[in-house]
Amino acid sequence: MTQPYQRILFATDQSENNVTALERTAEYANKNNIQLDILYVLDPAIAGFGNTQIELSSESLYHLEEKSIGQLEIIKRRLIISGSSIYQVHVHLRIGDPRIIVAQEFPTEYQNDLIVLSSSRKNHLQRFFTGSVSSYVIKNAQADVVIMH
């Protein structure tokens, strides 16, 4: 990475696959004094078991939001304990299509110049119905994109 990045977006699916990739990204951000946005996108289509015709009740959505925010705060605390600055790490939750939010909406709003994704936990059937977030982001993002395993 030769370009001095200013703000990194790490998009998480809150799976165990993300842990190493997030730790490495946070270490890079910390060493280079770069802002780190950690984003989780709650996809109602997936939360509704893949059927976009079934809408989640507002109570169910509220509970999913609260659980997700709690998990993001745990991630933030772990990074701060391991050396990141409280002013450097920011956690965010959005609801919608992860492909659009990660590739376009969020980086535009927060001016992220690097997007980091980790390898997907979706199986082939899920990827068939919902599409690959990574593939979409690579094709449509204006920022540089890194996929970590």
Name what the model sees in each region.
Residues M1-Q3, I80-I115:
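Structural beta-alpha unit
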Residues M1-T20, S82, D113, K139-H149:
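Intrinsically disordered or low-complexity boundary/linker segments at protein termini
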Residues T2-E55, E109:
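Small/aliphatic-rich secondary-structure junction motif
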Residues L39, H90-R94, V146:
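General small-molecule cofactor/ligand-binding pocket signal
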Residues F49-E59, I74-S85:
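Inter-domain helical "communication" segments and dimerization helices
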Residues L56-G70:
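A short acidic, glycine-rich active-site loop
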Residues L93-D97, S120, H149:
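Short beta->alpha linker loops
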Residues L114-K139:
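Glycine-rich, Arg-bearing micro-motifs that act as flexible, cationic patches
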